[in-house]
Structures are given as C-alpha cells and as structure tokens.
A protein has these predicted regions:
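N-terminal subdomain of nucleotide-sugar transferases
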Residues: 1-64, 89-91
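Carbohydrate-associated surface elements
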Residues: 47, 164, 184
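An aromatic- and histidine-rich active-site surface loop
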Residues: 95-123, 127-128
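Nucleotide-sugar donor phosphate/pyrophosphate-binding loop at the beta->alpha transition
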Residues: 118-120, 128-150, 187
Length: 189
C-alpha cells in the first residue's frame, strides 16, 4: 500500500527563517507535517548568517548565497554547489517540491536530473509584481518573466495556491496544466 509507505521530500525555497514571509511559513509547515506524519522532509534554502536551523525537527541544508537584500529583500542563492548536491543525494529523496520559480527551481531541476525523481512546483504569488518592483527596465522585466515561465514549464507538475494565482500564471504566458492546491490543506486517504 503506497499510502502508508514513508516518503522523503525535498522542499526548496529562496526564503526560509530567519526570513519570514508567507512562502517561508508554508515551506516550514509542509516540512513539519511531512516529518511528523508522512516520512522525511529536507529543506534546501540559501545560506543566511545567524540562522539557527537546530530548532527544526527536519534537516535544513543551506547553500552559498550573496546579499541582495537591498534590491529584492532576500539573499540570492548560488545553486551550483557540489557539496549541496552530494548532501541531497545522500538523503534518498523521492520527490522535489520547489516553491520559488527562480534560483530554487533552477536548483530543483538540476537535482531532478541527478536524482531521477519528480519535481512539483507551487506558484504562490504574483511574481510579475515582484519583478516590476525590482527591475525598472520593461525589456528586462519581460525577459525575466519569460525565463520564469520557462523554468516553471519545465517542472513535472505545477500547483497554484488559488484559482487567481493560476490565472496570474497564465497571464504571464504559462500554457501548461496546473492544479489548485490551497496552502494549509491536509490530504487524507
């Protein structure tokens, strides 16, 4: 019976405590529930100085980052880390779940290729607004959105947190299928 089989899920996001935002909270909650009820969760996120990951009941693997908080409010992860790849490979991951369509999903795609496991992406927010706030050139905004949509389109399955988020994703040019999967919903068999 597959429903009772324990799974190992790798959750990847560009934000995680000490940064607090809605997506970081969702990832923390996903990881806690998976770890408590369904198997093993591993969170992969950029390095932040003074982060205390020992408080979590699941491992948090951090990879190198650069400080771009003045530009976008976050540290930008540098996902080309052989050490991180080896650490994740050692966790025997069954599923990768990315929550940010930029660095996290680039890393998730590299891990999927290496581990041969499915990649789910959740679209949480209107990234076109974030891009417009961070990049003032219209041409660069359009190129960034195109890359974002290509990154999302490369995932095996796409979830959105609401119908409105799905419509926003479509308005950016995404043409694939998506499943509305509201945060905070626990699926029981």
């Amino acid at each position: 019976d597959l429903s009772s089989e324990k799974r190992s899920v790798c959750l990847i996001n560009d934000s995680f405590p000490p940064v607090i935002d809605g997506v970081a909270n969702a990832v923390t909650n996903y990881a806690s529930i998976i770890q408590r009820n369904y198997g093993d969760a591993t969170v992969v996120t950029p390095y932040y100085p003074d982060a205390d990951d020992s408080i979590y009941p699941f491992p948090v693997l951090r990879y190198p980052s650069i400080d771009v908080t003045k530009l976008v409010g976050y540290r930008a992860g540098l996902p080309l880390s052989p050490e991180l790849m080896a650490q994740v490979e050692g966790r025997h991951i069954d599923l990768i779940h990315s929550h940010c369509p930029v660095t996290s999903t680039i890393l998730a795609r590299m891990l999927r290729q290496r581990l041969h496991v499915p990649l789910v992406f959740t679209y949480h927010t209107k990234f076109d607004i974030d891009i417009a706030n961070a990049i003032h050139s219209k041409r660069l905004q359009e190129a960034s959105i195109k890359l974002l949509v290509e990154n999302i389109s490369a995932c095996d399955e796409v979830w959105t947190v609401s119908r409105g988020a799905g419509e926003n994703l479509r308005s950016l040019g995404y043409q694939g299928d998506y499943i509305v999967m509201p945060n905070g919903v626990e699926i029981t068999a």
